[in-house]
């Protein structure tokens, strides 16, 4: 039957076509933070917390992982005597996000 792929051919397609997904970005919360920062370039911790509905502790851990990967910078400062944490996407973070999106698209277009 035309268009039908046998098991062996499907194995070859999956080996050849599926790109590995970045494990740092594959987390739902880290991906959400990166998606927000792609459009905003930088955002306050409180904004990210509100938009992602994450707890402070979980968000703090996840942005630390993004920082360790070099995907974001974390700037801690004071604003009117109140502590303020700003997350800023890096060029490496932009590239990683774009590569992640391309990898996902390759799964869809097979």
Whereabouts are the PLM-identified features?
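N-terminal helix-turn-helix DNA-binding core of bacterial DNA-binding proteins
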Residues: 17-58, 77-80, 84-88
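Short, hydrophobic-biased segments on the C-terminal half of alpha helices
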Residues: 63-64
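Short beta-strand "wing" residues that participate in macromolecule-binding interfaces
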Residues: 74
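Amphipathic alpha-helical dimerization/coiled-coil segments
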Residues: 2-10, 15-18, 35, 91-110
């Amino acid at each position: 039957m035309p268009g039908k792929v046998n098991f062996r051919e499907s194995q070859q397609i999956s080996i050849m076509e599926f790109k590995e997904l970045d494990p740092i970005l594959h987390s739902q919360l880290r991906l959400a933070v990166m998606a927000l920062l792609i459009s905003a370039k930088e955002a306050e911790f409180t904004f990210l917390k509100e938009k992602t509905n994450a707890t402070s502790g979980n968000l703090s851990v996840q942005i630390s992982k993004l920082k360790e990967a070099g995907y974001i910078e974390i700037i801690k400062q004071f604003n009117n005597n109140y502590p303020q944490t700003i997350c800023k996407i890096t060029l490496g973070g932009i590239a990683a996000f774009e590569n992640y999106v391309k990898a996902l698209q390759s799964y869809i277009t097979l």
